[in-house]
Amino acid sequence: RLASDFPHQAAHRAKDGPYYSPFNKNYNRMCRVFDALFVGRYRRRGTRFLTKSELARKFLLEKRLSPEQVTTVGVGIDAELLRDRPDAGQTELEQKMRAQKTGLKLLYIGRIEPRRDPFFLLDVLAEVRKSDPDACLYIIGDGDAEYVDSVKAAIGEKGLESCVFWQKKAPQYQMKGVYQQADLFLLPTEYEIFGMVLLEAMFFRRVVLTTPNGGADMLLRSGENGLVLEKSDPARWAKTLLDTAADPEKKARMEQAAYETVIHENTWDAL
């Protein structure tokens, strides 16, 4: 009866699949309250939970729920929605990517916010350009105006105005061309319940470099179908990107492995 009395708590965990992260201070405080009120009764009644990632499952098991109560189901993608559309056309960003003839093309897609740390992206780009002066960063995303303005100011302060190209949004049916023009996809997130952009980038055969997070934990075998690094050193990220690009055969194997991971394990049909 408890799950029906408090469906929002049960559904919240089943749907969103959170896990512990120091970044989530407000959520961590909320969890302490929920745990005190509900977890003991969930244990006694054997309430079952579905999670999006193994990190989320571990988070619940640490609350002394039994393994039988918690099942990881992952997240799927509708591959048909990402297939070719002859009338898709090109975004302005894709046109700029096509115009770049030399240098790495790095891509970030997502909200511009502290959790995704766009300032770290700029630091990585600056490090990459020490070895590859023509490298550029392409961004699709928006956020709170004040924060976006601070990121734009940092671009100027770091002297990156000529190599960072930014579009606030683009329709899903035009994303294929953007992904496929990129050499590598970056997601330096502090915390990610799953991250659909990881699935999309892998579906379009891009090598992903990201942090340990909910989606990476489920999708990526670092060095095989993508790359996972702690977000501690922009120079290390830059070296990883440059080393990956310098080995086209290995990069191609990783791109194909990324695609096969999604097709065989992470479409809704596969799940």
Language-model segments: what does each one mean?
Residues 190:
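Aromatic "clamp/platform" in nucleotide-sugar-dependent glycosyltransferases that forms part
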Residues 149-169:
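Nucleotide-activated donor-binding/catalytic signature segment of Leloir-type glycosyltransferases, i.e.
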Residues 25-49:
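Membrane-proximal helix-turn-helix segments that form the acceptor-binding/catalytic region
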Residues 104-127, 149, 235:
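A conserved mid-protein helix/loop that constitutes part of the nucleotide-sugar donor-binding site
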Residues 169-170, 177-182:
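Short alpha-helical donor nucleotide-sugar binding micro-motif in glycosyltransferases
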Residues 222-223, 227-234, 243-248:
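Conserved acidic donor-binding segment of nucleotide-sugar-dependent glycosyltransferases
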Residues 207-210:
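Short hydrophobic beta-strand element within catalytic cores of glycosyltransferases
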Residues 55, 76:
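Carbohydrate-associated surface elements
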